[in-house]
């Protein structure tokens, strides 16, 4: 199954290790043309990281982190692809001035998140409060001297050089309470490892991204790599 931009097959539960990973064709952000899972088939395993839109401070931070993580995973022979849920034009504008250091694709309609079965909840006041609480935790971690959620969001935006646009607001309203995940897919197109936001820790896991050590350990274990081995 190949997912084209704007067309979505919705899974009711996340893909599991051993499942075939649905292919996709999405606009590239860091270069011209498109990017697909088929680009990696037969060549290298790839860590896929579909994110929310640029409005998400956690996702902006995680994509920046992946620029460093990528170098460590490539030493194991593993490629990385981040997918940001906004229009290619919006993503290119933001990352033109803040290069991510990782290959990027744009998926404004959440086709990959839905096809890979990543949970989605309506953006109820309760769900909004979960995200607000985690933003407060992030502000504390970054030593941002603010307690009001609007002040925290503004401070995080300034820190990232991010100015919200109408496109971002439309993305937020359309996406609702979308969670994210990471999927390690081998060169044969089979899922070998997954991590779903909040699955292990509940609300405390919202906004968290695996550490480099966790990702490297997952790559070695799921791909059967010994010390010093590459995929």
Question: What role is predicted for each listed range?
Answer:
Residues 50, 83, 185:
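Catalytic metal- and UDP-sugar-binding loop of GT-A-like glycosyltransferases, i.e.
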Residues 107-202:
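Thiol/selenol-based redox catalytic cores and closely related redox-interacting motifs
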Residues 35-67, 79-80:
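Short active-site neighborhood of thiol/selenol oxidoreductases, capturing the structured segment around
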Residues 2-38:
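N-terminal "domain-start" segment that seeds a small globular fold
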Residues 4-5, 155-166, 220-227:
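Short, positively charged
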